[in-house]
Amino acid sequence: MEMLPNQTIYINNLNEKIKKEELKKSLYAIFSQFGQILDIVALKTLKMRGQAFVIFKEIGSASNALRTMQGFPFYDKPMQIAYSKSDSDIVAKIKGTFKERPKKVKPPKPAPGTDEKKDKKKKPSSAENSNPNAQTEQPPNQILFLTNLPEETNEMMLSMLFNQFPGFKEVRLVPNRHDIAFVEFTTELQSNAAKEALQGFKITPTHAMKITFAKK
């Protein structure tokens, strides 16, 4: 029997070797593009290994995430996604703290986020001044240049985003610079397809990735 759409999606067939904190960060990175995430639950108990729950604020966000990310290769294993059996019942049983106020527990979070929003307004203004020119000036290249990446970005996270595109070769991070990276493809056509698809992809709610062709 199919589950009715709700804010919580259930994911299984996850790689059991990934540490819990890294798993949660990576899930957040690929699912935050669909809408505000209230919580991610991933436990390493024997019964719950290879499974996780992502709780969105809106049902529409959960529906888009389920439809778009079904079968997405995540740490070399295709994700299997379904709606949770009921809005938060399973999560409540797992966490033991989620039952009474599943949606009221999280709303205080926007308060500290107000500073981030101010930063968000400042940062794009400086980035946008230089980037549009870069995008028009650089001719096609099989190597892409990524900017505006958040501090928690790592090679595995970017590889998961880009390896779904044909011709993906490698991700190259820049030492002592968390905000930029290079991604190489076999041909310029392949790199352009990835560039068009992931332009503006939100790795976190405050960081929309900017992609240009690298200088030749």
UniProtKB/Swiss-Prot annotation:
<keyword id="KW-0687">Ribonucleoprotein</keyword>
<keyword id="KW-0747">Spliceosome</keyword>
<keyword id="KW-0508">mRNA splicing</keyword>
<protein>
    <recommendedName>
        <fullName>U1 small nuclear ribonucleoprotein A</fullName>
    </recommendedName>
</protein>
<dbReference type="GO" id="GO:0000381">
    <property type="term" value="P:regulation of alternative mRNA splicing, via spliceosome"/>
</dbReference>
<dbReference type="Pfam" id="PF00076">
    <property type="entry name" value="RRM_1"/>
</dbReference>
<dbReference type="GO" id="GO:0030620">
    <property type="term" value="F:U2 snRNA binding"/>
</dbReference>
<dbReference type="GO" id="GO:0071013">
    <property type="term" value="C:catalytic step 2 spliceosome"/>
</dbReference>
<keyword id="KW-0507">mRNA processing</keyword>
<dbReference type="GO" id="GO:0071011">
    <property type="term" value="C:precatalytic spliceosome"/>
</dbReference>
<dbReference type="InterPro" id="IPR000504">
    <property type="entry name" value="RRM_dom"/>
</dbReference>
<dbReference type="InterPro" id="IPR035979">
    <property type="entry name" value="RBD_domain_sf"/>
</dbReference>
<dbReference type="GO" id="GO:0005685">
    <property type="term" value="C:U1 snRNP"/>
</dbReference>
<dbReference type="GO" id="GO:0032991">
    <property type="term" value="C:protein-containing complex"/>
</dbReference>
<dbReference type="GO" id="GO:0003729">
    <property type="term" value="F:mRNA binding"/>
</dbReference>
<dbReference type="GO" id="GO:0042802">
    <property type="term" value="F:identical protein binding"/>
</dbReference>
<feature type="region of interest" description="Disordered">
    <location>
        <begin position="97"/>
        <end position="142"/>
    </location>
</feature>
<dbReference type="GO" id="GO:0007539">
    <property type="term" value="P:primary sex determination, soma"/>
</dbReference>
<dbReference type="GO" id="GO:1990904">
    <property type="term" value="C:ribonucleoprotein complex"/>
</dbReference>
<feature type="compositionally biased region" description="Polar residues">
    <location>
        <begin position="126"/>
        <end position="142"/>
    </location>
</feature>
<dbReference type="GO" id="GO:0005686">
    <property type="term" value="C:U2 snRNP"/>
</dbReference>
<comment type="function">
    <text>Binds stem loop II of U1 snRNA. It is the first snRNP to interact with pre-mRNA. This interaction is required for the subsequent binding of U2 snRNP and the U4/U6/U5 tri-snRNP. Plays a role in regulating sex-lethal splicing.</text>
</comment>
<dbReference type="InterPro" id="IPR012677">
    <property type="entry name" value="Nucleotide-bd_a/b_plait_sf"/>
</dbReference>
<feature type="domain" description="RRM 1">
    <location>
        <begin position="7"/>
        <end position="86"/>
    </location>
</feature>
<keyword id="KW-0539">Nucleus</keyword>
<dbReference type="GO" id="GO:0000398">
    <property type="term" value="P:mRNA splicing, via spliceosome"/>
</dbReference>
<dbReference type="GO" id="GO:0035614">
    <property type="term" value="F:snRNA stem-loop binding"/>
</dbReference>
<dbReference type="GO" id="GO:0008266">
    <property type="term" value="F:poly(U) RNA binding"/>
</dbReference>
<dbReference type="GO" id="GO:0005634">
    <property type="term" value="C:nucleus"/>
</dbReference>
<dbReference type="GO" id="GO:0097158">
    <property type="term" value="F:pre-mRNA intronic pyrimidine-rich binding"/>
</dbReference>
<dbReference type="GO" id="GO:0005681">
    <property type="term" value="C:spliceosomal complex"/>
</dbReference>
<dbReference type="GO" id="GO:0030619">
    <property type="term" value="F:U1 snRNA binding"/>
</dbReference>
<dbReference type="GO" id="GO:0048477">
    <property type="term" value="P:oogenesis"/>
</dbReference>
<keyword id="KW-0677">Repeat</keyword>
<dbReference type="GO" id="GO:0008380">
    <property type="term" value="P:RNA splicing"/>
</dbReference>
<dbReference type="GO" id="GO:0019099">
    <property type="term" value="P:female germ-line sex determination"/>
</dbReference>
<comment type="subunit">
    <text>Belongs to the spliceosome where it is associated with snRNP U1. Interacts with the SMN complex.</text>
</comment>
<comment type="similarity">
    <text>Belongs to the RRM U1 A/B'' family.</text>
</comment>
<keyword id="KW-0694">RNA-binding</keyword>
<dbReference type="GO" id="GO:0030532">
    <property type="term" value="C:small nuclear ribonucleoprotein complex"/>
</dbReference>
<feature type="domain" description="RRM 2">
    <location>
        <begin position="142"/>
        <end position="216"/>
    </location>
</feature>
